[in-house]
Amino acid sequence: MAQREWVEKDFYKELGVSSDASPEEIKRAYRKLARYLHPDANPDNSAGERFKVVSEAHNVLSDPVKRKEYDETRRLFAGGWLGGRRFDSSFGDFGMGGDGAEFNLNDLFDAASRTGGTNIGDLFGGLFGRGASVRPSRPRRGNDLETEADLDFVEAAKGVAMPLRLTSPAPCTNCHGSGARPGISPKVCSTCNGSGVINRNQGAFGFSEPCTECRGSGSIIEHPCEECKGTGVTTRTRTINVRIPSGVEDGQRIRLAGQGEAGLRGAPSGDLYVTVHVRPDKIFGRNGDDLTVTIPVSFTELALGSTLSVPTLDGTVGVRVPKGTSDGRILRVRGRGVPKRSGGHGDLLVTVKVAVPLNLEGAAQKALEAYAAAERSSGFNPRAGWGR
């Protein structure tokens, strides 16, 4: 989104948060609204438009750099340096000169910024552009989109290819994004001769401004595409295949370049951000790149030693339990955990937990009683050294 558009928009209000809201509060507010307004969950057209606005707000406020620029821009136009005056956003980059001399607004802005805060020239560079002349305005890049994906634990750990269904502005399939009727090309603007700018003189000053005939694009579409009405964009439902990388964690945000909202008249598309939600697994857990599992064992398996068959992400592995292992001990199997982004795998951490039988009968009962007697005779005291 261009900075010049920030002046008229209150992103905090759109998300229902205060201007000093924490990143976590902004994230929670966006998720709540997105789940209700997403076109797949709410077919109302107004909900779709609102979803785009909410996504724009989150895209700016969730980025620390963009949020700072947004706050500075809003404060500047709220009545500070510019006294609350509104500026026509049709102005692009501009400069003024006369009698061979130039008046550099950036010098004024840089001096003003020395009182503290963001360089005001930088802000105006985004709002009106910098330079000695106007450049032809390019069609604006499409907005970024936000969506969510629910994954099973194993899918998140190993990675998965999955389809995502999106309803959003996309390049018009009829004109392929040009905005012109198929077979007819846009013509060069005769007012500005394709430059996109008009040079004017006022007294001692000369300045340039965007051409109002072609709106700074340098070309005019005389015969607009009937499908998109000349915008090059239509709203449609599309399905894209997304590769979720291995090792993603719950709440992680994945960027897919160029998969967002289409830009007007052939401009580049925005990006798609996918927030991953991982469903808990009844067997596996995770500690960073380590895979965790708690396995029930009998007392005799710990006391006498044994080999356990333990599940992993890729089948089972035999884990040796040393003789005399304590309940709750963690056994490590190297390289059998979650795939790492840098290559290789984390470890498998196996916690052994004794399962006590509720009822013993017959030979098992007698054998355990005999063991208890032998244990007492040996002088073994499990609470030796414990307590005060």
Swiss-Prot record:
Cofactor binding description: Binds 2 Zn(2+) ions per monomer.
Gene3D superfamilies according to UniProt: DnaJ domain, Heat shock protein DnaJ, cysteine-rich domain, Urease metallochaperone UreE, N-terminal domain
Domain of life: Bacteria
Repeat positions for CXXCXGXG motif: 172-179, 189-196, 211-218, 225-232
Keywords in alphabetical order: Chaperone, Cytoplasm, DNA replication, Metal-binding, Repeat, Stress response, Zinc, Zinc-finger
Family annotation (InterPro entries): DnaJ (IPR012724), DnaJ_C (IPR002939), DnaJ_domain (IPR001623), DnaJ_domain_CS (IPR018253), HSP40/DnaJ_pept-bd (IPR008971), HSP_DnaJ_Cys-rich_dom (IPR001305), HSP_DnaJ_Cys-rich_dom_sf (IPR036410), J_dom_sf (IPR036869)
GO MF, one annotated term: zinc ion binding
Domain J as annotated: residue spans: 10-74
Family matches, as PANTHER family: CHAPERONE PROTEIN DNAJ 1, DNAJ HOMOLOG 1, MITOCHONDRIAL-RELATED
Stated name of the protein: Chaperone protein DnaJ 1
Native source species: Mycobacterium leprae (strain TN)
Name of the gene encoding the protein in the UniProt record: dnaJ1
